[in-house]
Each structure stands twice: as structure tokens, then as C-alpha cells.
Amino acid sequence: MKKLYIRTFGCQMNEYDSEKMADVLGAGEGIAKTDNPEEADVILFNTCSVREKAQEKVFHDLGRVKHLKQLKPDLIIGVGGCVASQEGDAIVARAPYVDVVFGPQTLHRLPALIAARKQSGRSQVDISFPEIEKFDAMPPARVEGASAFVSIMEGCSKYCTFCVVPYTRGEEISRPLEDVLAEIAGLAEQGVKEVTLLGQNVNAWRGEIVRDAGEEGDFAFLLECVAEIPGIERIRYTTSHPREMTQRLFDAYVKIPKLVSQLHLPVQSGSDRILAAMKRGYSVLEFKSIVRKLRAARPDLSLSSDFIVGFPGETEEDFEKTMKLIDEVGFDGSFSFVYSARPGTPAADLEDPVPQETKLAWLARLQKRIDEQAQAVSQSMVGSAQRILVEGVSRKSAEELMGRTDNNRVVNFPAPSPHRDRLVGQFIEVRITSALPHSLRGEILTRES
């Protein structure tokens, strides 16, 4: 059997897309995945262009597999994802040994691209945007474990000044309601108990309640439908946009117990001046109002966020406003980075007088504060009973299992060997016994039937 190696960079959307690449090639080519690139017949890099370092790392890693092409002339090397969309033919010009280049919307064409490469002897590039065609062409999802990602929409229409996503993944396109629910129902039949709904702006999803009937459902309606699917016990979603947080979505946190008490809500900055320069479309006051409404509906809601430090023109005063917002909201997790100019975005043309060492110092302060708040939340959970979904063997010890709480905390706990395998994929109750810097420890209380 032929083997497929995939290296994934970037977001959870890319993780999902990589699984779909494996599904497409598994169904069409009979190829199985491997963790060893040296034994692979197909090597794919699913790329991210959000930050410059991630982009350059792709070409670095391509160079590391170049020699395999000489050892195995029939080896197929492909580059997909957002760097592929952004660079296109330039990838082949820079790395002529690359056989196929494809975008996020054309990954379903991989078998045809590989066949064309073999037939013609020329590298194949397809970075077009055929809207939702990708999902129509996908084979049924194959999953292992009780948790799965489901992409419900593609692209972004917000055009924040720092972001390449609208240019690399296209504008927002929602999958039809029936298709999303059918995929999730199929996953539930395979034993999946937890789904994470994915999209660049996942809460911007819109879909017809009945196809061709003209009546439109919003993201809150979709959540209600997912909650009714037998076997699905826990629902997450990412990444959301503050501008798409509606009253109906706030109400969903009251109506839908299966919706977790954790939300990733990117704010990017605590300065109105910087938010306006980023073209985020909300003020700090409006963001705090959203947080108040969310916590009125779900008081124990855990919030994480995205932060960009050192945006062009940011001052010490702007940064201190971000730190103040972090304290006021109580964020307990973040993806935070120093601003990286992306070619083709409006912000790339702005003057950027802030020294790099200042930006790095700001980032260190911000991350330290977030870590402190995360530890405080974890410490507050010690002694409490928590419902977790057991995901598998702990990385800490083969004698232990690990799972996640409703608010997305990793819990490691000892499990007796006769029952260890049977607990994987099940919900159980654990008592939290201690809080470590990046995880919790617990002990089993009960197992759900």
C-alpha cells in the first residue's frame, strides 16, 4: 500500500483540511497515512501564511525532503494551504521539485492533480476558488476517537487590515445546513461524542433551513440542530468574530447545555485607536458589552482570545489599554504574537516605528499576565468535580489517561489497567486534585453509562 505523509502548519482549519486530504487520497488512491516522510510515496505540506516565520518554515522543510526525490523519483511532493494560494507558481519557481500546488478550496482535486503530474511530467498548480465544491466532492469522513472537527464555512469577508485570509481562502461561504448535519450525524454513528465547528468566522454561518425555501437560519439555529443529533454530547466552535455575536447566540448559552462553557473570541487589541486601524469593526466598550452578555447567559464561561502586539503605530498607552482589558475580562488563554506584515494587506504599507525589542517586551508581559490568569482559573477548579471526555493515554505516563473539561482544561489521571482501554472515548467524572502550569491532575469519581 502506498503511504502519505502530511505536515500541517497553522490553525485548526488546516488540521481539518489535512484530514480531508487523507480522506480524498485514501478513497481515490488507496493511500494510507504515515508519520515517516522517508517511507512516503506522497508528501504534502499544508501551509499557513498568517505569519512570516510560518511561511519561511515551509520552504525550509521543503528543502529537507528534496533529497528524497532523488532517492525515489516517483515521489510526489505537494504544497497546499494558504501559502500555496498566496504564492502559486512562485513555489514551483523557488522549489522546482514540487509536483503539485493547491489551495484550501481545491484540495479535493488532489487525485486529478497528481494524475496530471504523472501524465504530463509537469508541475500542476490549481489555487482557484470554486466556492463550496470542495465539500461536495469529499468522501465520508473517517475518524478515530470521540472528538472531531467539522468545517461549516470557508473564507472571510471582514478584510481586517493585517490579515491575508480573505485573499488566500476567499470570502465567506457557508456550507448548506443539510450537509453539515449529515456529516455530524455520520460522525456520531462512528462514536464521536464531541464536535468542534470550524470556520474563519464560524459564527457568521448562514444557511437555508430547507433548501430552496428561501428561509435562512443563523449560527444559533445551527447549534440548536447539532444539539439534537443523537450521540453528540458536547459542542465547541472556533474561531468566532465579535461582530457576529448576536442576542440569539447569547441565548444559545442558556438553551443548549451541550454548548461548552469556553469560547475563543479574538479581540486583537484593547485600544480603540488600534482596533480602528485594524478595521475590526467594534470598540473596546462594545467588546466588553459582548462579554457581559455572554457571562450573563453562562456565568462560568472561560474566555480565550487573540492578541497582536506591536501593530504599526501602537504606543505604550495603546498597549497598556490592552493589558487593562485583559484584567477586566479575565482572559485565561491566548494566541498572541508580535505583528508580522503580510504582503498585499493594507497594514503592510503603514509606518512601523516601534522597535522590535519593545514589541517583544510587550509580548512577554502580555503572555505572563494571561498565564497568571489561566493558573488562577485552574487553581480555582481544585477540589471540584469535572465532567471530562477521555481522549487517550496521557503524555505524562502510560499508566494514566487524559481528557478535557468543559472549559478545555487538560486533565491527567491514573486509571487501573483493566479499565483503561474501556474509558477512552467515554465521559467520566473526575475530582481535580492539583493545578499544574498547563494541565490539571485528577482522580476518577464516576463513569457515565
From Swiss-Prot:
Its cofactor is [4Fe-4S] cluster. [4Fe-4S] cluster 2 binds at C156, C160, C163. CDD domains: Radical_SAM. It is found in: Cytoplasm. Binds 2 [4Fe-4S] clusters. One cluster is coordinated with 3 cysteines and an exchangeable S-adenosyl-L-methionine. InterPro entries: Elp3/MiaA/NifB-like_rSAM, Methylthiotransferase, Methylthiotransferase_CS, Methylthiotransferase_N, Methylthiotransferase_N_sf, MiaB_methiolase, rSAM, rSAM_horseshoe. Belongs to the methylthiotransferase family. MiaB subfamily. Monomer. NCBIfam families: miaB-methiolase, MiaB/RimO family radical SAM methylthiotransferase. This is tRNA-2-methylthio-N(6)-dimethylallyladenosine synthase. It comes from Azoarcus sp. (strain BH72).
